[in-house]
Amino acid sequence: MIKKVNNFLVIILVFLAVILTELIMFMELNSLTLLKCFIFVDLLLVFIPFSLPRMGGKVSSIKNLIDAIKTRIFFFNSCLFFSKIWLYENKITIFWVYTIWNGLNSIFCGIFMEDNYMADIYSISPKNGGGDPAEGNTPSGNPDSTISYDFLAEARDRINTHKSEISTPTEGDKAILFSKDIPTYGQKKIYFQESSGLLSRRGLAPLSVREICDTLLTDKGLPPLNTVGLKSHLNTVDQNIVLYKEQVVKFNNTLRGIDQGNEPFFPDSSKKLFLEYKEILPHMVEINEKMGTNLCKEIKAKDPSFHHPLLTNNDSTSKPKEK
């Protein structure tokens, strides 16, 4: 019932606007005043139907606004077309000015119509190619969850392509890499391609975190590996320690150049980032040294003749000083 009343009021408003337009055409008004009258009627037809009450006491929806705009465009353009024969010669120019104004309103109407369908677009997952929106909805109904899921799926693919070539993926690795949870490293070492382009041309080694296995730092013991496998991991730890220590020196040189104003590549605004890198690197060195020490102890237990600087340093620091 209320919808019928709303439609009736819209028709009445359009009819009154047409009559008002006809009266304006017979009045002796200058061009500027005539244009103001046209715009006033135009706005009247756009915003008054939008404020009409509907069921529940709420204002009209965007769809009702679009319907009102389309109705106004049809009737008002027809009115102006038939009223053109009554226009004085000095008012013809202002008629075309208003025609352009009306055309812009038509574009405005099209924008509202496109915006009305954005909710349906966002509810469709990119994976299903724009099929049934219900197929692309996430359990929570949040489109951000769909986007995050697609992003994580792409991240899992990237992890798989950059996986270390020294070992083939096992069934356990596949379960980790292709699970629906956040990607994890598991018990296998994963290499990422180094950004050797820009950084290498600037004499900077890439800051890549290459960890072995979290179990090396726990009380559960090392994974079951033979001596060859342990030495392979230890070699990687040694490379990481050298890399991180070299990067500390290079970051210090970059920070010194920024402070002295002779840094050729990085702007002053990058100083904070390099300070954060410099703060992270000692922690990375400490972690790798701890993992390397655990590896050395495990190898030493299997091969008593094994020697490594990490074992020597650890023994010297653990022994009490002689008085």
From Swiss-Prot:
GO terms for cellular component: mitochondrial membrane. It is a multi-pass membrane protein. The chain crosses the membrane at residues 8-28, 32-52, 92-112. Keywords: Membrane, Mitochondrion, Transmembrane, Transmembrane helix. The keyword Mitochondrion applies. Its main location: mitochondrion. It is found in: Mitochondrion membrane. This is Uncharacterized mitochondrial protein urf-LM.
